Structures are given as structure tokens and as C-alpha cells.
């Protein structure tokens, strides 16, 4: 019997492919407003500080390809065909949906490479995909809202956290704290009943409990540069506060809201948070990001198959 064909729409934030893309990329993020020359220069310096344009573009594509392969390897009923759709740079979400339609794909399942639901992120991706599909008259898209508590996803982080704690002396472990974080969003989402903060708290609790970590805290990072209040505490402030109030001398940063090595992790954690730990005379740790690790890819595949009940 012929396999049923299904689109696999993998959506992500996107990143500049080369330095010349930085301005148009950030102009898109800023809803068509060009960044000032100062802001643009600051962004270029940040990319320079992490060794050049972030590897995110290559990693995202690799994650998507590996997910397609894994899904086709572990079941025989459906042949998945992957389409990559990005939020702020080509191929845009709409481009991917259009391509599916042109390829005759009637049904698709979509997953966003971010574990926690929010109206700002997951919902906006899903709405863009569905709006384009509706305009074209197909495909039907089965969206995934969240996978923040998927056991295999939690297990990936538990393993990485345990490795870090195992590298410490008993004395260091006693004064170590795990900081679990995600990208901050404007505070107004709370008033709207957005589950984003609650889902991050759930992920943090699951990881800490399963890894046997006594001391942990939830923080936010990479807040936007706008006048409105953003979710806090910021991870840098939290680091200083925990050191001052609790006397922690080792900090293990787990930016679970992200799934790859990119600017927010390589700069905001590995440079900015590390600078704070150096200022207060503490140790800095940051377990490796999921990227295209087979265990992480398997977690995503499990999430997709659960959504279409295979």
C-alpha cells in the first residue's frame, strides 16, 4: 500500500545568513522600522563577539532535516516531507506553506522550534501558517501548541544538567544553583492570561526534580529594548541577587526556551552572564544546547507523532 504523504512544517525565528542581512532582518523584527545606526552597530558588535554571524541558520536547517529523517525512520504509515518556514527572514512561513500547496500537499503537521506556548511566539507562527493555507485553499495544517513537558525533551536537559553537576566537587554542588530561563516577553501577556510563564516554571520544576537538583530558580533573558515592562527577573539581576542573598558560588544556566546555539545564548549567556559571575567571583556553567542532538530530535519526532496520534 502506498504511504500517505504529509507535509512537515518546521517553523523557527530565523537569523541573518550573512552580515549584510542584519539590517533587513532587524527591520523585519521591528515591523518595518529600520534600526538606528547605533543599534545596528551594537548588533554587529555582538555578532563579532560570538565569532561572526550566528550558526543558527545552519543548525535550524539541520534540525529540520534530521526531524524529517527520524519521522520517516520510525514509522511506515506516512511519508513526511519537510518544509522550513521562518518568522523574520526567507524562507518565510508563508513561502513554506505556498510551496506545500504547489507540491500538492493536502495535510501537514507543524511544529515551532520553541517549547513554550505564547501568543507572541507559537500562536503568531501558527496563525500565519493557517492564514496563508486558507488563502490558498490548503493544505490543512495540524498545529502543535507546546511541548514544554515532553518527557524526552526534559530527559535531554536532565542528562546535560547531571553531567555538569557530576563535574563539580561535593562542596561546589552545595553552593550551586540552576537558573532555568527563556526569552522574556512584554509583561502585558500575563494580564491576557498567557500560559508562557507557567509553562517555563513547569519545565524548570520537571528538570530540577528529575536531575535531583536542590537549588533552582527561574529567570528571563534577552528582553527587548522598548519602554514597556518585560517579564523578570532578568538572569543577570537574578545571578547577583542569588549570590547576595543565598551565597551561591556556582551558576548553571539552562536557557530551555531556546533549542540552539545562537546570539541569545552565545552572547546573552556566555558573555553577559559569564561577566556577572566573574564580577562576583562565582563559577559559570552552561550545558550544551540541543542543536541536532539525536535525543532532542527524537523528542521532537515523538511530539509530532502524538499530535497526529500515530
Curated annotation (Swiss-Prot):
Binding positions for Fe-coproporphyrin III per the UniProt entry: 13, 30, 46-47, 54, 125
Superkingdom of origin organism: Bacteria
Enzyme Commission numbers on file: 4.99.1.9
Residues that hold Fe(2+) according to the record: 183, 264
SUPFAM superfamilies: Chelatase
UniProt cross-references to PROSITE patterns, sorted A to Z: FERROCHELATASE
Cell cycle among keywords: no
Keywords noted in UniProt: Cytoplasm, Heme biosynthesis, Iron, Lyase, Metal-binding, Porphyrin biosynthesis
Metal-binding found in the keyword field: yes
A GO BP entry: heme biosynthetic process
Gene3D superfamilies: 3.40.50.1400
GO molecular function annotation: ferrochelatase activity; metal ion binding
Catalyzed reactions: Fe-coproporphyrin III + 2 H(+) = coproporphyrin III + Fe(2+)
GO cellular component: cytoplasm
Subcellular location: Cytoplasm
Pathway where it operates: Porphyrin-containing compound metabolism; protoheme biosynthesis
Family label: Belongs to the ferrochelatase family.
NCBIfam families: hemH (TIGR00109), PRK12435.1 (NF009095)
Function in brief: Involved in coproporphyrin-dependent heme b biosynthesis. Catalyzes the insertion of ferrous iron into coproporphyrin III to form Fe-coproporphyrin III.
Protein's recorded name: Coproporphyrin III ferrochelatase
Gene name, Swiss-Prot/TrEMBL: cpfC
